[in-house]
Amino acid sequence: MRLARLSTPIIYDENQKFEIGKMVQIGDGTDATIFATGVTVSEAIKAQEELKQKGINVRVIDVHTIKPIDEEMIIKCAKETKRLISVEDHNVIGGLGTAIADVLAEKYPAKLEKIGINDTFGKSGKAQELMHYFGIDAEAIFNMFN
């Protein structure tokens, strides 16, 4: 399921270089890492800003390409932060969270919390309402820390 009908904010300037298979780190928090892809990156950044006000410093990792997965970044984040969370506008089975979990299981065992669409049928509605309904918006990410 993809909910990316929203107008999303511009995160990077025009000089940002992207490399296939290399994630981009946004912030350097050590309390948690939030791996996000697509429209959920801006939601993760909103949550990051709100969490900082509570004294919780998280890093957001923009997974702009899932395949090939950036194993190096996943392991680095697992070593450097206390919590790992993936968030995606996709089924929690077979998506970003699963790809990260596979790396962790094989290379550096660590707990991963997944935010996404549970294995259920989709709904119709406005994109932001659906993100809230399925619990993949900034509020849901923020609430993971309460």
Residue locations for each model-derived region?
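Thiamine diphosphate
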Residues: 2-146
